[in-house]
Amino acid sequence: MIPVVIEQTSRGERSYDIYSRLLKDRIIMLTGPVEDNMANSIIAQLLFLDAQDNTKDIYLYVNTPGGSVSAGLAIVDTMNFIKSDVQTIVMGVAASMGTIIASSGAKGKRFMLPNAEYLIHQPMGGAGSGTQQTDMAIVAEHLLRTRNTLEKILAENSGKSVEQIHKDAERDYWMSAQETLEYGFIDEIMENSNLS
């Protein structure tokens, strides 16, 4: 059930679902697994807010276990395409593809709540048991290319070398907010609501 908020206007009461009300304040909630429908919704909201006023920041709150690489990269590409700065605020967890999205916020405007966590690891995927040998080679090549792309993005977003990212992402690498700050994926740990 999606909560509804009621506002008093000069014409009486007006009700909004909570996400529509947050959108009026340029807040987008990226929660749950990253998949195509969710990504399309996030992208549409980013484009709408940028078209409305590209001089104001957009606030993207992130709490996701990760998910589809192609859907996540579509969000990242849109964040980079629009003129509005996108502030990212991690609450709960930014794992896997979520780290790519959250760390791609505007430099100096990437935040994390004190008890949130970050996870980097290599992309998952593979060929099913009914896959032909030649298709397995194609899948393996695509997976390596995807890993290289994601490692380059993480290196650019953190200031670490691609080699360091490759080493750290070999296995699940969990980070606290403080560790994420020291690693370079965020710019500040938020102790209170100090967004401007």
From Swiss-Prot:
Q: Which gene encodes it?
A: clpP
GO cellular-component term (any):
endopeptidase Clp complex
Q: Which reaction does it catalyse?
A: Hydrolysis of proteins to small peptides in the presence of ATP and magnesium. alpha-casein is the usual test substrate. In the absence of ATP, only oligopeptides shorter than five residues are hydrolyzed (such as succinyl-Leu-Tyr-|-NHMec, and Leu-Tyr-Leu-|-Tyr-Trp, in which cleavage of the -Tyr-|-Leu- and -Tyr-|-Trp bonds also occurs)
**Xref: HAMAP family:** ClpP
Where located? Cytoplasm
Q: What class of enzyme is it?
A: hydrolase
GO MF terms listed in the record are: ATP-dependent peptidase activity; ATPase binding; serine-type endopeptidase activity
Q: How does it assemble?
A: Fourteen ClpP subunits assemble into 2 heptameric rings which stack back to back to give a disk-like structure with a central cavity, resembling the structure of eukaryotic proteasomes.
The enzyme's E.C. designation: 3.4.21.92
Q: Which Pfam families match?
A: CLP_protease
- TM regions (residue ranges): none
Query: A Gene Ontology biological process annotation?
Result: protein quality control for misfolded or incompletely synthesized proteins
This protein is called what?
A: ATP-dependent Clp protease proteolytic subunit
Residues the record marks as active site: 96, 121
User: Where's it mainly located?
Assistant: cytoplasm
Superkingdom, taxonomy of origin: Bacteria
Q: Which family does it belong to?
A: Belongs to the peptidase S14 family.
The alphabetical list of record keywords is:
Cytoplasm, Hydrolase, Protease, Serine protease
What the protein does comes down to: Cleaves peptides in various proteins in a process that requires ATP hydrolysis. Has a chymotrypsin-like activity. Plays a major role in the degradation of misfolded proteins.
The record's section on Gene3D superfamilies has:
2-enoyl-CoA Hydratase, Chain A, domain 1 (3.90.226.10)
Asked whether the keyword Cytoplasm is assigned, the reply is yes
| Keyword Transmembrane helix in annotation | no
